[in-house]
Amino acid sequence: MSSNFLHMPMTITMSSQNFQHHDHSSYFASITKDIEAHLKQSIIVKPPFTVYEPMYNLAFTTPPTSAPLLCVAACELVGGHRRQAVAAASSLHLMHVASFTHEHLPLTDRSNPNPMIHHAYNPNIELLIPDAIVPFGCELLTRLDNPIEDDHADRVLKVIVEITRAFGSQGIIDGQFHEKVVNRSNGEEENNNADWIDYTCRKKEGKLYACAATCGAILGGANEEEEEKLSKFGLYVGMIQGYSKIGRGKEEERLKRVEELTKLAIKELEHFKGRRVEEISSIILGP
């Protein structure tokens, strides 16, 4: 299994007596293996090689997110089977790849470029290939065929809507805009603005993880209340991820906010007492 494909979530011990956490790395490792296998089976390097070769490489070299793992865990939490969510998890990863690649284009007009990102391809390739990855990610969902479930097509359609909304102008793109453009125009003062940081984390990582949890719930056959609970759980987990990536600002305030979000996330899982909440709750403070 590729070591840089998907990070394993860290496990933590919660103060709440309702949740006792153990090492569930093997659980997430098995999910990672299934997602990776699905991607390798789906993305075949074939003509035109100028499209599929960089698409394949970007899919397996882009710094990963644990959101796809959350998608599968949410599906299993509500009683679904992993096979129902692996394609959606793979699609989420590809959408993340496209978004990440576009966000880190080596543009010369950026005031604060990121020197840590390795660029294997020219900017024109990194600009165009993600535009091919996005529809391909949606195509993975449409290939699913599950005659056992009468409403399977409806579930897939709902998932496609969730994913496109999360990565669109009301979600991650909006967060990227505020992080890059607004930050550049307002200077360092905005970097330490609590409202700005919270908004960015909510729109970027928050929307991604909320989408992942919601998609897993939908495919697993959750009811509306379960979908809402897991969507909120994903939102809080994603925002925690966002705050963990911020290496500047007031450390004490950030830690306080993360603690608040952790409590909110745990509260949403109380609805699922008696189910396999340990696995999904261990993703709260992932990498």
Curated annotation (Swiss-Prot):
List residues binding dimethylallyl diphosphate.
Answer: 204, 241, 250
Tissue expr: Mainly expressed in trichomes, and, to a lower extent, in roots, leaves, flowers and stems.
Q: Which GO terms describe its biological process?
A: isoprenoid biosynthetic process
Does the entry feature the keyword Transferase, yes or no?
yes
- SUPFAM superfamilies per the UniProt record, alphabetical: Terpenoid synthases
Q: What is this protein called?
A: Heterodimeric geranylgeranyl pyrophosphate synthase small subunit 2, chloroplastic
InterPro entries, sorted: Isoprenoid_synthase_dom_sf, Polyprenyl_synt
